[in-house]
Amino acid sequence: MQNVLVPYDGSPSAERAVEYLINFAKVFPQLKVHLINVQTEAKLYGNYVSPAMLEQLNAGALDHAAEINAKAAERLKAAGILHSCHEVMGEVVTELVKAVRQHGCNTVVMGTRGMSNLGNLVMGSVATRVVHEVPVPVLLVK
């Protein structure tokens, strides 16, 4: 576990995953962490919203994702852990599979439950899908 992808949404469960890695890095200081926050694209049907408005909504979602990632990045930086932040639009599991391949990650460390855009606890089903679809080991942190 040297190059780790962490799906991060700011939920208590995701915070525990970051805390786990901070402690892990005390023993394995060569750890590299990729924080990723995946936002769902705004999709509105009909002629109610212009394409420019949809672009603004998506840009706002990515800005929000960067703010969320920044909180965990501060903790990783304070612990001296090499890290990078990634904010993407798309379907969560699909984007996580892409990120694992793109960044050469050999492990995914994630919480068992997270927050949806509406504040509902939904990551349990996402965690299950990640375990089945990501081509590397997945460590779930309770």
Please name every model-derived segment.
Residues M53-E67:
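A short acidic, glycine-rich active-site loop
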Residues E74-V108:
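Structural beta-alpha unit
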